Structures are given as C-alpha cells and as structure tokens.
C-alpha cells in the first residue's frame, strides 16, 4: 500500500513541494528568505483580516477607527503594529531575496525571476495603498503626490489620475477603492507566489556555486524544514522586538496628525522601503523623466538575464563582480538616505550622482566586468 502522503491528490502536491523535494546540499542561509517571505505574507493577511474587522474606509472615521483599534480593541495595538512592522520585515526580506538572486545568478531561471519582479511590483502597490488607509497627513499627501505622477503620461495622464481618484482630488472615493484593492491584492499575491514556486520547481533551486547540483541532492524535509524554522525564529524575535520596544521607529510622526488637505507637510516622503526609488524620482528635474526613471529603477531587474554576459553563473568566484555588487548595495543605501532628506544642496547633487551610478553600474559596468573576467580566465 502506498503512503497517503504520496498518493493523495492534494497531499502529494505538498509532499513534492515541501517534503520529498530534492534540494541542493549546499544552499546557504541566503536561501531562507523565500520561506520567510511566505511567513510574512501569511502574517500580513492574518493581521490585516483582523484589522479590517474594526477599520472603516471613510474619510471622516478612518483615522478615528485606527485610534479605536489601538485603544479599545483587545490587543488591537499589537495587531496594528505587527501589520505595520510586518510590512517593513517583508520588504527587508524581499530586498535580501532579490540581492541573493543577483549575486548567485538565480535570474537565469527567467520565468521564476520575471514572476518575482511582478510579485515585487504588486507588493509595492499593496504597501503603498495600505499606507494611505490610516488617513494621516503623510497618508493623504503621499497618495496625492504618488498618484499625481501618472498625470505625466502624455495625452491620457490627467484623465487617468482623476479616474484613479474618483473625483478631482484624493477623497472618500479614493480611500474606499484603495481599501478594496489593499484587501484583494494579498490574495492575488498568494496566487502569484504559487506560480513563482511552480516555475521554480520546474528547474529546481540554484546553489552558491552556480553549478548543476543534480548529482548531490538531499530531501527538503527534515534538512531545510528545520533550517527554515530557525530562520522563522530569528524573524519572530526581530519583529516582536521592534513591535514591543519601538513600534514607531520606522513610521513617520506626521501620520499621527489627521489628514488635512489645507496643510501640506514640509517634507512629503513615503515609507523607508520606497525611499531609494523616491530619491531616483526626485533626482530628475522633469516630471515625465522622473516617472520613467522611477519605473526603470524597478523594471531594470527584468534585464538582468539579458545583461548576464559571464561564462559563470554565480558571483562566488568572480571578485571584480563582487566588488560591483557591493558597490550597488552601498549605492542603494545612499539613495535610501537621500530619499528621506529635504530637497536642498548637497542632497540634490548626491541623489543625482547616486541615481546615475545605479543605472551605470547595472547597465554598463556589470556586463563589461563580466566580459573582462571571461577574458582574464581565457574563456
């Protein structure tokens, strides 16, 4: 008699994905982020569901309903801050996951990679709409500034913006639709994650060496299940420390003031995880140019499989490419810092230089270095 785990139509899918899955024997802790992202998504859906039970998507009561959740609902403050800081953890893991993919050449699995980029875009849209919901000052003005960028699209721009707003400014209609989208998108993300995994399991995982690991595979369970549990523990400790000791560390104090269309905050900025893209947007003194640069800063990821000119897949044995990779990471940290600074000298110049370096490194320096390494190795 066959084991139910291997014969049951539903359980066997789980078995092939998480139990008997052949995995490379040498994947490092950098391969933990996929499961951590899955956990984050589950946590966000769960905490979000409980928040939605008490939240009202109406301009007059949205801010008060969030205050009510924090003050009057049992452990409402905990649910709210787990949701807010859970989003930050989500993006930290996303950026690590993408960085791992770039470093070890995982983008050569083009289907999996492109699905991942679409996942990133959808997650960014979800997070942006979620930030609007508490209807504080930064929620309102962030929504106004970011949606207004679409007006830079020639011909259809202004009409498109008013269509998204549901009126002539960010108002009740905007808040209601943003809540509807913010609720539905995580479920769409879950479906996309399943497709992402489907594509991944067609090829199997990459590994730090970048070489084929078919000759040395081990079962996912118990080896990597226990490893994922360890990663999960680290995540829970970090998240709960953040939630319990400094829940507002990553937030903006302006969002504790109710939205006021008649009073513009001195510095409008998004959440920290969008600051690098915001800095790129602001570094171009032209609206359409800025919007195109903003879109390119994310969509450039889709070009990585084409720009891969090295004969080796991974950067593990390519010291010059490693230097460029860490230069890119530092550059993104500088952009993140600049995105949170006021638009004045010297920040404008630093932002412009960092933005230029970002595109120059990814589009020109990295492919040229790969060719040079091939030459040095006489390949």
UniProtKB/Swiss-Prot annotation:
Comment on bound cofactor: Binds 2 heme b groups non-covalently.
Ligand binding (heme b b566): 97, 196
A Gene Ontology BP annotation from the UniProt entry: mitochondrial electron transport, ubiquinol to cytochrome c
SUPFAM superfamilies: a domain/subunit of cytochrome bc1 complex (Ubiquinol-cytochrome c reductase) (SSF81648), Transmembrane di-heme cytochromes (SSF81342)
Keyword Transport: yes
Biological role: Component of the ubiquinol-cytochrome c reductase complex (complex III or cytochrome b-c1 complex) that is part of the mitochondrial respiratory chain. The b-c1 complex mediates electron transfer from ubiquinol to cytochrome c. Contributes to the generation of a proton gradient across the mitochondrial membrane that is then used for ATP synthesis.
Other facts: Heme 1 (or BL or b562) is low-potential and absorbs at about 562 nm, and heme 2 (or BH or b566) is high-potential and absorbs at about 566 nm.
Protein name as catalogued: Cytochrome b
Organism of derivation: Ctenomys leucodon
Name of the encoding gene: MT-CYB
């Amino acid at each position: 008699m066959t084991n139910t785990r291997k014969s049951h139509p539903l359980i066997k899918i789980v078995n092939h994905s998480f139990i008997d899955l052949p995995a490379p024997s040498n994947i490092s802790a950098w391969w933990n982020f996929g499961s951590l992202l899955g956990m984050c998504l589950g946590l966000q859906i769960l905490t979000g569901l409980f928040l939605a039970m008490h939240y009202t998507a109406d301009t007059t009561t949205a801010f008060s309903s969030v205050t009510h959740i924090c003050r009057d609902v049992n452990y409402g403050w905990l649910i709210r801050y787990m949701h807010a800081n859970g989003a930050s953890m989500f993006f930290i893991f996303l950026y690590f996951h993408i960085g791992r993919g770039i470093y070890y050449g995982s983008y050569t699995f083009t289907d999996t990679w492109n699905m991942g980029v679409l996942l990133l875009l959808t997650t960014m849209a979800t997070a942006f709409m979620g930030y609007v919901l508490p209807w504080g000052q930064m929620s309102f003005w962030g929504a106004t500034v970011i949606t207004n960028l679409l007006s830079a699209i020639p011909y259809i721009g202004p009409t498109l913006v008013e269509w998204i707003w549901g009126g002539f400014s960010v108002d009740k209609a905007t808040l209601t639709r943003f809540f509807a989208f913010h609720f539905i998108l995580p479920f769409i993300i879950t479906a996309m994650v399943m497709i992402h995994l489907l594509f991944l399991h067609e090829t199997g995982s990459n590994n730090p060496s970048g070489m084929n690991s078919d000759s040395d595979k081990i079962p996912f369970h118990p080896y990597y299940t226990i490893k994922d549990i360890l990663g999960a523990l680290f995540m829970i400790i970090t998240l709960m420390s953040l939630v319990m000791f400094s829940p507002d560390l990553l937030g903006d104090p302006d969002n504790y003031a109710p939205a006021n269309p008649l009073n513009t905050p001195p510095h409008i900025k998004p959440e920290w995880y969008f600051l690098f893209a915001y800095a790129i947007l602001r570094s171009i003194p032209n609206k359409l140019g800025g919007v195109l640069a903003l879109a390119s800063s994310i969509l450039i990821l889709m070009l990585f499989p084409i720009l891969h000119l090295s004969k080796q897949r991974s950067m593990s044995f390519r010291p010059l490419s490693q230097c460029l990779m860490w230069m890119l990471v530092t550059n993104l940290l500088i952009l993140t810092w600049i995105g949170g600074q006021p638009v004045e000298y010297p920040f404008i110049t630093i932002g412009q230089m960092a933005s230029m370096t970002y595109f120059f490194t990814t589009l020109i320096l990295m492919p040229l270095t790969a060719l040079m390494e091939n030459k040095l190795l006489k390949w």
